[in-house]
Amino acid sequence: MTPELIFIVPYRNRAPQKKVFECVMPTILEDEKYKIIFVHQKDNRPFNRGAIKNLGFIYVRKTYPETYKNITLVLHDIDFMPYYKNQFKYKTKQNVVKHFFGYTNTLGGIVSINAGDFEKINGFPNIWSWGLEDNVLKRRCQVAGFVPDRSTFYHGGVDEDKVITLWHGWDRLINPKIKRKFTATTNLDGIKILKNVNYTIEEQSENISVMHVTNFITGESHLVGSQDTKLRNSRENKFFKDGYDGKNQNVNRRQTGLLPVMIIPKRRQRSIFKGL
């Protein structure tokens, strides 16, 4: 049976967050026809979020070749989840892109898009080591004439207490040459140029799979590890240096190690995590 919703959740080095996600979301989605695919980049290269999400789509297309164009893809960060059923109406339709959590200048965080539409715009750019892929996705959707739906939307800088938030570090590798290239342009880089893709599928349950990606080649693979790639802090300001928990500024994220910091009102913690 073809699911109506397929969640594509990219991750690497996020085992605690993945554990929370796979415990919470089945309860949230128990009334839906859904599938969750964790797409795990398993090599030693910098994380390529755009390519990893594109590979999730490629797997969906291969698995459901006759029906994939009518599936709603939910591009979902592993660090954020709804608190309760029907908080987000994930299902969308052709030419409508739903944005539930994130920032309005991008299409990142939690986004629903028709799989046929995602293919039409060639998915995300395959950008190594930086998060610009969400900005480019927004531009591609605008050019295609898709309608953004933020009728239920929580802003990442203001409304983090309205969703389950699992904090992690903010350090990323940024390649300035690639940033300049993708600020300029086209739909050429995306799903269509990925090649030499190798992966295995781990079926964790009827509704949850892990796609372990061990290799893929993009148009920019030759730039990985180049000298102009520098370690920077993508949100360098006093709050994120000193630690900030949304209210009391008493969580130092640089000391949290691999464990996620959960920003959850106490009144909701017991009901959400009683099954963990």
Which stretches of residues belong to each language-model region?
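Acidic ATP/Mg2+-coordinating residue in the GHKL
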Residues: H40-D43, I78
